[in-house]
């Protein structure tokens, strides 16, 4: 359980969202039930999650999963590491690459990471640092490798995971077992 209990009564329209989340994830997510205390926050969180891009053109699912995992590790969120790391082998993410995401190994030392993946990981890490410090040069380094659309998708993906990491940790939501062996 988290730091607080979910409400006993959840509006019917939020129960539909909880059902959809359970169908998509295979888990009855505590965070969704806790958000029922603030229905507008639950609705906006669900919309954000539903509308975020999970792969588009050259920003494939592997690259975006690397970004999600990087933010999860950088924010030290056990739930997020569990959820965003689940199925990493299906995307070809190796143990060496996970060491990069965990900050154990420099990205340049892992040949399997492409230059774009290295840049995206670095950008995600910078988006998770506190305090945030961005200069035009931080985005200028991305421009030769990513389109404007792709830069926005990278930024919104990292921001989305940052949102969830802070919310989940603030409410004490434990890992949900996404990475547990079947």
Model-derived features: where do they sit?
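Short acidic alpha-helix initiation/capping motifs at coil-to-helix transition points
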Residues: 41-46, 76-80, 119, 128-136
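Acidic/histidine-rich alpha-helical segments that form the ligand environment
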Residues: 112-155
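Acidic/His metal-coordination segments adjacent to aromatic residues that form catalytic metal sites
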Residues: 102-115
């Amino acid at each position: 359980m988290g730091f607080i209990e979910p409400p006993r009564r959840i509006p019917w329209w939020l129960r539909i969202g909880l059902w959809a989340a359970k169908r998509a994830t295979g888990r009855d997510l505590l965070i969704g039930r806790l958000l029922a205390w603030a229905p507008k926050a639950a609705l906006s969180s669900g919309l954000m999650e539903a509308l975020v891009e999970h792969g588009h053109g050259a920003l494939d699912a592997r690259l975006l999963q690397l970004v999600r995992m990087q933010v999860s590790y950088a924010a030290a969120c056990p739930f997020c590491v569990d959820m965003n790391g689940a199925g990493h082998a299906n995307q070809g993410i190796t143990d060496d690459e996970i060491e990069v995401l965990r900050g154990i190994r420099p990205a340049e030392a892992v040949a399997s990471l492409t230059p774009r993946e290295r840049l995206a990981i670095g950008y995600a890490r910078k988006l998770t640092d506190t305090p945030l410090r961005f200069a035009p040069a931080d985005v200028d380094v991305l421009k030769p490798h990513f389109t404007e659309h792709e830069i926005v998708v990278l930024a919104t993906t990292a921001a989305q995971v940052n949102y969830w990491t802070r919310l989940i940790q603030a409410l004490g939501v434990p890992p949900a077992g996404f990475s547990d062996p079947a």
